[in-house]
Amino acid sequence: MSRGSRFVRAPGLLLCRVNLQPQPKIPSFSYSLRSDYRLHNGFSNYIRRNSIRTSPVINAFLSDNSPSPSPSPSPIRFVQRSSMLNGRLFSTSTPNPDQTTTKTKEIKTTSSDSDSAMADMKILRTLAGYLWMRDNPEFRFRVIAALGFLVGAKVLNVQVPFLFKLAVDWLASATGTGASLTTFAATNPTLLTVFATPAAVLIGYGIARTGSSAFNELRTAVFSKVALRTIRSVSRKVFSHLHDLDLRYHLSRETGGLNRIIDRGSRAINFILSAMVFNVVPTILEISMVSGILAYKFGAAFAWITSLSVGSYIVFTLAVTQWRTKFRKAMNKADNDASTRAIDSLINYETVKYFNNEGYEAEKYDQFLKKYEDAALQTQRSLAFLNFGQSIIFSTALSTAMVLCSQGIMNGQMTVGDLVMVNGLLFQLSLPLNFLGSVYRETIQSLVDMKSMFQLLEEKSDITNTSDAKPLVLKGGNIEFENVHFSYLPERKILDGISFVVPAGKSVAIVGTSGSGKSTILRMLFRFFDTDSGNIRIDGQDIKEVRLDSLRSSIGVVPQDTVLFNDTIFHNIHYGRLSATEEEVYEAARRAAIHETISNFPDKYSTIVGERGLKLSGGEKQRVALARTFLKSPAILLCDEATSALDSTTEAEILNALKALASNRTSIFIAHRLTTAMQCDEIVVLENGKVVEQGPHDELLGKSGRYAQLWTQQNSSVDMLDAAIKLE
């Protein structure tokens, strides 16, 4: 019986296995009501008009979507190393929580802000390195051209209020007295040289607006290739690096957390490039130009109004945004919790029905919805306060400027066109400033997300090639374990000085109780882990001193729990050797006794197997895995309890295929059922990480030792189960 399972009896009923293992989490969906809908939509549209058109998202290539585990006082803890997102699994006990908290607070108060700022600058420098590709002149030209279009767009944008002012003044003079028109002509000689009529000025106004928009679109078109290539390069590098990390790292991390880091990090790069480079910087340039123009044309008072209003607007927006961030976090957490609860309930649909607990599930789900509702209301109220405060600041500045303009008009120092121009310049600043809060919040979050992704690149694998590693030279496939010690945690030995030999071309079964270290032996031979001490050799070569790719290409593994890609059957078999021909794939399927079954499917080899192969039966999945290993044609075969979860008929079919696969190959079988072990040339019996017996099946039975006990126990269990079934 597998771990976490029970046989449950009830009056008149025999209920089959109840799996007590926790269900794996899957990516949560969002049902958010979007309380920031107006601001969110406006900001999204603004970014869409002024930045990269597409927002690439790296699809989930891993399976889970769970958050990283939080620290807890237990013998196992996650230790954060320098420039690491999360630490490896260590054995030291967690210190006193109070002491840890005190030390953490002391460190944070002295260096967290400066360290964070330095880390942010390092991230931006790293990103700049991807943008300014020294070995790619085309991309450097695109960056320079985009900056040129950026400046051109802002220069033309500032001309729009000027042209509108001139048109208003000209029309006002033309409808007034002759003296007014003469005065206008005398004060604007250049205008009359360029434009013949007020209509021509208005046409120029339209051309300036169109030109500004055209420059913005050209900037986007020129720069988008650079931005998208940057996202692609970083994402591919991180993805490849994750595959280069060792198994210990992946066992200490939740796969969904890694997926979310890459997904959020790639989107963060897109945001930083679009919002920061093409919106924040242009806004700063435009504010400087507008302030300078107002100071030059109308005096320092107007420049002060602009500068003070913009400064107040920024300070107020950043302060309120920082304050309301906690409400957004609470809302997002409630959203995630509700989504997780809903999905967890739905994937356990049958369990809910078995116990008639639909009402309970609905009530629990509603509790999470209530938390989301409360947090969303707080977010909405704080957003209303932010919008109202921004409106007061901007309206005050605009009204003050209009009052000064009206006084200037009454005094004869300004014209109606000047009032229109000042109004237009200030309104041009209002659009990007309206989204300052969103830009600030998203920028801070983007830097955090980018930091998490770039820190993945600083993770180092414990399993690497040595500097003088050589390819594995096979001379038959003789395997030798010599006094091997290994432990995942120092206080718990997994392998305690084991030694045995698998002769070339022979098969060895490894048996023992759960936790005795059987599967660990296969992992160490494949070099997912290195020994704490002792040596593992293949044909006399220490596997630590050979290249990983040559070692792993020589070994084929048939796991107990076969996981297939959510693709076609053909792809899953072909994955064993990507250079194989179509006919070789079919031949591998025949040897695994799965070809006829596949041929009876409506889509044959094009049948999609579903996520993790769940559309296939257990036996079909195992035979697809066998076909994949047949196609790889390794010199060494490792088989980890491949038939433990199968019925007797399917087990017999799989064993026949395994015999064919193991023929003339060095093979190691982890045997849960001793009927598998008895067919091997040699049997190694493990107990508490040590080899307690070794020899052929008949010889071990004759010794009446540990193997004989296991054999008797297994046969007795089968007899008792048969008797129980007959009693029913």
UniProtKB/Swiss-Prot annotation:
Q: In which tissues is it expressed?
A: Expressed at high levels in roots, leaves, stems, flowers and siliques.
SMART domains per the record?
A: AAA (SM00382)
Quote the InterPro entries the UniProt record gives. AAA+_ATPase, ABC1_TM_dom, ABC1_TM_sf, ABC_transporter-like_ATP-bd, ABC_transporter-like_CS, P-loop_NTPase, Type_1_exporter
A GO CC term assigned to this protein in UniProt: chloroplast
Name its pathway: Cofactor biosynthesis; molybdopterin biosynthesis
Q: Which UniProt keywords apply?
A: ATP-binding, Ion transport, Iron, Iron transport, Membrane, Mitochondrion, Mitochondrion inner membrane, Nucleotide-binding, Transit peptide, Transmembrane, Transmembrane helix, Transport
Gene disruption phenotype:
Plants exhibit an enhanced sensitivity to cadmium, dwarfism and chlorosis, with an altered morphology of leaf and cell nuclei. Mitochondria accumulate nonheme, nonprotein iron. Decreased levels of molybdenum cofactor (MOCO) and reduced activities of cytosolic Fe-S proteins. Reduced ability to produce abscisic acid under normal conditions and in response to drought stress. Male sterility when homozygous.
Short name of one Pfam family = ABC_membrane
Domain ABC transporter, which positions?
Answer: 479-713
ABC transmembrane type-1 domain location is: 143-445
- Looking at the keywords, is Signal present? no
The residue span given for the transit peptide is 1-97
Where in the cell does this protein reside? Mitochondrion inner membrane
Q: Name one GO molecular function term.
A: ATP hydrolysis activity
Up-regulation conditions: In roots by cadmium and lead.
How is the protein disposed in the membrane?
A: Multi-pass membrane protein
Q: Where are the transmembrane segments?
A: 144-164, 166-186, 188-208, 275-295, 300-320, 383-403, 419-439
Q: What is its main location?
A: mitochondrion
Protein role: Performs an essential function in the generation of cytoplasmic iron-sulfur proteins by mediating export of Fe/S cluster precursors synthesized by NFS1 and other mitochondrial proteins. Not required for mitochondrial and plastid Fe-S enzymes. Probably involved in the export of cyclic pyranopterin monophosphate (cPMP) from mitochondria into the cytosol. Mediates glutathione-dependent resistance to heavy metals such as cadmium and lead, as well as their transport from roots to leaves. Regulates nonprotein thiols (NPSH) and the cellular level of glutathione (GSH).
Complex formation: Homodimer.
Q: Which protein family is it in?
A: Belongs to the ABC transporter superfamily. ABCB family. Heavy Metal importer (TC 3.A.1.210) subfamily.
Q: What is this protein called?
A: ABC transporter B family member 25, mitochondrial
Say which species the protein is native to: Arabidopsis thaliana
**Gene giving rise to this polypeptide:** ABCB25
